[in-house]
Each structure stands twice: as C-alpha cells, then as structure tokens.
Amino acid sequence: MTDNQRQSTTDGQPETRDPAQATAEAAEQTQATQASAAVEGELQDGSADSATGASLSADDGADPEALRQRVEELEKALADAEQKAEEHWDQVLRMRAELENARRRAEKDVDQAKRQGLEKVCGDLLQVKDSLEMGVQAAEDAEADREKLLEGSQLTLKMLNQVFERFEIEEINPQGERFNPDYHEAMAAQPSDEQEPNTVLQVVQKGYRLQDRLLRPALVVVAKKGDGGAGSGGSVDETA
C-alpha cells in the first residue's frame, strides 16, 4: 500500500481497491477452496477403498482350506445320499418282486388245493358209481333176489353218506321244524289245525350245505292257519 493510501486510511477515508485485483484475489481463493475440497474427497475415497479392500481381503482370505473342506463334506454327503437312495430303490424293487412272487405262489396253491379237493371227491364218488353199476347189473337178472338188491342199494347209499361226511356236506331235512328262508324254499302252504303256521309239514326235496355254505335249499310245504278245509296254496311268511 502507498503512503498516500495509508494517509487516506489514517484520515478516516475508505480504502479504494482495484476491481481487477479484487477479482483475481477472489479467483485465487475459490481455486484454493476447490483444491482443498478435492484433496479431502480423495482422502475420504481412499479411506473407503481401503476399508472395502480390507473387507474383501478378509472375505477372500477367510481360510480357503476351510472352504475346500466344506465343499468336500457337501460333496461326500451328496454322494452318500445318492447311494442310500439307490439302495432304497433296490430294496423297493426286491420287495415288489417278492410280493408278486408270493401272490403267484398263493394263487398256485389255491388252484392246486382246489384240484386236489376235486380229485379226492371224484375218487370217493367213483366207488359209489361202481356200487350203483353193480346194483343195476344185478337188477337186470330176472332171478335177482329182491332183498339182496335192497341191501346193495342201502350199502351204496351208506357209502355216499360217508363221502358227504368226509367233506362236511350236511343234509337239510327240516320235517316238523319252523320254516327258515335261509335254508328252505316253500313250494306251498296248507291249512293245519295241528301245527303252528310256518311249520314244515312235508319235505318235497332235501337240501344240502357245505359247512356254512348252502348248496341247495330244501323244498318244503308249510302250514298255515286252518280255515276249516283242506287244500293247498296260500302265502308263506318268508320272514319267519
């Protein structure tokens, strides 16, 4: 600053500045501020990059050997699971084959049992047939003894009853019994003052059952409430 300028300031007059100089000083100050901000930003970016790099280094360097072992463990577990699945599938296939074989054996055994049972029945009936043929031949003789023919027929019937007994074939002869629609079939109903209604008065044809299975129902005539006259017909209580 010149002596005249100092004098002016001393005298209380405002200092006058060159506009160009003021503009230059302002530009220098702005550049200095921008440079300072740029340096500070670079420092901050460098710190962030350093932190990120350190984090990545920590992740990337998180014991590669442990990661490799973990991968090997997972691969081994997967291989074991696949092996077990294959073993289980083989077991399923074997069990399926065994069940199919068992089913076939059971069917074969049932068929064989049926054939054996039928063969046994037929074998026993052959003896009855032989006896009947002998009786027929004896009856054809004009000089045949009637009593001997009767004895032969009775013997044949006895043989047949023995066959039925061996195979648990039971005769149904419900004479005088109460009508049972499960084992009897009513052919007619007759009035009766001596028997209660639905009582079997006559067995037209005997029935037979094999154990608990009905082979043939007995054909019967049942009693109904007397109406003062004889005759046939009328209804039967099928629910008796």
Curated annotation (Swiss-Prot):
<feature type="region of interest" description="Disordered">
    <location>
        <begin position="1"/>
        <end position="89"/>
    </location>
</feature>
<dbReference type="GO" id="GO:0051087">
    <property type="term" value="F:protein-folding chaperone binding"/>
</dbReference>
<dbReference type="InterPro" id="IPR000740">
    <property type="entry name" value="GrpE"/>
</dbReference>
<comment type="similarity">
    <text>Belongs to the GrpE family.</text>
</comment>
<keyword id="KW-0963">Cytoplasm</keyword>
<keyword id="KW-0143">Chaperone</keyword>
<dbReference type="Pfam" id="PF01025">
    <property type="entry name" value="GrpE"/>
</dbReference>
<dbReference type="GO" id="GO:0005829">
    <property type="term" value="C:cytosol"/>
</dbReference>
<dbReference type="GO" id="GO:0006457">
    <property type="term" value="P:protein folding"/>
</dbReference>
<dbReference type="GO" id="GO:0000774">
    <property type="term" value="F:adenyl-nucleotide exchange factor activity"/>
</dbReference>
<comment type="subunit">
    <text>Homodimer.</text>
</comment>
<feature type="compositionally biased region" description="Low complexity">
    <location>
        <begin position="20"/>
        <end position="38"/>
    </location>
</feature>
<dbReference type="GO" id="GO:0051082">
    <property type="term" value="F:unfolded protein binding"/>
</dbReference>
<keyword id="KW-0346">Stress response</keyword>
<dbReference type="InterPro" id="IPR013805">
    <property type="entry name" value="GrpE_coiled_coil"/>
</dbReference>
<comment type="function">
    <text>Participates actively in the response to hyperosmotic and heat shock by preventing the aggregation of stress-denatured proteins, in association with DnaK and GrpE. It is the nucleotide exchange factor for DnaK and may function as a thermosensor. Unfolded proteins bind initially to DnaJ; upon interaction with the DnaJ-bound protein, DnaK hydrolyzes its bound ATP, resulting in the formation of a stable complex. GrpE releases ADP from DnaK; ATP binding to DnaK triggers the release of the substrate protein, thus completing the reaction cycle.</text>
</comment>
<dbReference type="GO" id="GO:0042803">
    <property type="term" value="F:protein homodimerization activity"/>
</dbReference>
<feature type="compositionally biased region" description="Basic and acidic residues">
    <location>
        <begin position="65"/>
        <end position="89"/>
    </location>
</feature>
<protein>
    <recommendedName>
        <fullName>Protein GrpE</fullName>
    </recommendedName>
</protein>
<dbReference type="InterPro" id="IPR009012">
    <property type="entry name" value="GrpE_head"/>
</dbReference>
<feature type="compositionally biased region" description="Polar residues">
    <location>
        <begin position="1"/>
        <end position="13"/>
    </location>
</feature>
